[in-house]
């Protein structure tokens, strides 16, 4: 019942936003918001078209570029996501979210070094981006920067102690530092928060503690 109601509400919002775009065809924000609502409704191609229109009207709209990049990433169009996020960074070097997105793209492409560069820039501009600290932990572990991994994991947990993946990554970082008791504590916390901790990791941890 509530799902149908939500869909009806979304359809109503879309209709209102479409009307606003007809009435104000030159409004960047109208097209931008329409794109976001289309995305929420799962109408991805229309979301792309609306955000592209917003960027056509204002090529310097960093927010529209970032949202278009996130949309492309979700659609698996990684190279397009890369291009628009690079465009956003060129316009605004201080955009933490654009740097974070580029880090995720390069991590997805398997380039841990490049990912780390962008993640480092992201938290320099906004130290409270918890997902970036979480991703940085994973990248540092891939590169076997164990001290840095522990530092990044600690920052994530400090920001959001009840973020399940932050607790999991802290457990893994502690494991690689040889602090198995602390690793067990944080793995248990991740499990309690509903995170599907890798069974192989739990087995390895149990073996070290036995």
PLM-predicted stretches and their roles:
Residues 62-63, 96-97, 130-131, 164-165, ...:
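Boundary/linker segments of alpha-helical solenoid repeat arrays
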Residues 29-40, 62-74, 97-108, 131-141, ...:
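Conserved alpha-helical positions within TPR/SEL1-like repeat arrays
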Residues 2-5, 172-176, 196-210:
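TPR/TPR-like alpha-solenoid helical repeat scaffolds
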